[in-house]
Amino acid sequence: YNANPIFVILIFACIPRSMILLAFTFMIQYIVTASQHDAARIAQLTYLKETDSLTRLFNKNKYNEMVSMYYPNVDNITVIFWDLNNLKIINDTYGHEYGDKALSALASVLYAHSDEQSRRVYRFGGDEFVMIIDNPHDGEADRIISAVKDELVKRSSDILIEISSAVGVASGNGSDIIEIVKNADSAMYADKQLCHHR
């Protein structure tokens, strides 16, 4: 290494400009490629952090993040709380493979009615799912619940086991998101108790 500026000038004078441009081109390509790989890796890690491995829905990590950072700033929200009926019976009778199929069937139906913009759906627990709707339209939640119920009847015939769910709904200001989710959960539990007595 020689810090003498005259030496540096002589070196650059001896190297053709085309070689210098080529070297810079390779450097830029390397930097761009490395940045793309880093971005892809970050996206993959984010997906794994936020996504439930079985259902491919948002998981509890993503739910907690949104409840903490996003929903308190939304004017009006509606929470729909679903709980898959008889999962233990399905697992015990047909095996966990069919239990997973039932969970995936409900999850795919819910996902079909989400848009990741104003209707996001999360796997809340083992057999529990939550959809949170930003600033819902009149009757929107009822239409979704009805459509999900009808679609589950069709899915039941596809996998040859009955798939149904208890459901509860609650609405309010986003600043009260925790309480709204609790109210929807309570309504779902009341619906489940009714299902058991039918």
Q: Whereabouts are the PLM-identified features?
A:
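Short catalytic/binding micro-motifs of nucleotide second-messenger systems
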Residues: 112-117, 147-160
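Hydrophobic transmembrane alpha-helices
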Residues: 1-14
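Conserved long alpha-helical elements within nucleotide-processing catalytic cores of c-di-GMP signaling
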Residues: 47-50, 59-78, 85-115, 122-126, ...
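Signal-transducing coiled-coil linker helices
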Residues: 15-53, 61-71, 123
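Short hydrophobic/aromatic beta-strand micro-patches
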Residues: 132-134, 170
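Catalytic/regulatory signature loops of cyclic-dinucleotide turnover enzymes
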Residues: 153-161, 176-198
